[in-house]
Amino acid sequence: MTNFNPQFEKIGNILIHEGCIEETQLSEALEEQKIKKDKLGRILLGKGFITENNLALAYSMQLGFKIISGDDLLNSNEDVVSLISEDFAKENLVIAVQKTDTTIRLAMEDPENLEVIDSVQKITNLKPEIHVAGKSDIENAIGILYDRIN
């Protein structure tokens, strides 16, 4: 028996290994993915097979990123949050949560979106450090934190 190493596995296999979905659900979602050309995680979410937290866990296991909770998002420093415009944050489901002199910690729903990561680096001139969060947690935090800022 081989050891399971999530960093070498596809998202679907991680979700099966973690008991979040069954093989039949993965097969159904993969068939739909051929038609819709969407990310597997989004299809599984749309079908109600997984939760946002299941997807965040799978991303964190696969990519080695930490998960950040909705409560921790709401404790973000507003000066840091405001480094990214509200429109950009909403459009890309990303929120700045912490910074140092050289880095900016981001919470993202899709940590594989390199275009967003590159854009944040250009906007802030800081090296992004990625954390994963659920879509609803990010949307909620964006709404509350940018309301406080405005």
Which residues make up each language-model segment?
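Polyanionic, low-complexity intrinsically disordered segments
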Residues: 2, 17, 42-123
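Short, solvent-exposed linear patches
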Residues: 5-14, 36-43
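Hydrophobic side chains in well-ordered alpha-helices
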Residues: 11, 25, 55, 116-119, ...
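Short, recurring structural edge motifs at helix starts
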Residues: 1-3, 27-32
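Short hydrophobic alpha-helical runs that function as membrane-insertion/retention elements
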Residues: 127-134
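Charged, low-hydrophobicity low-complexity segments
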Residues: 69-73, 80, 137-150
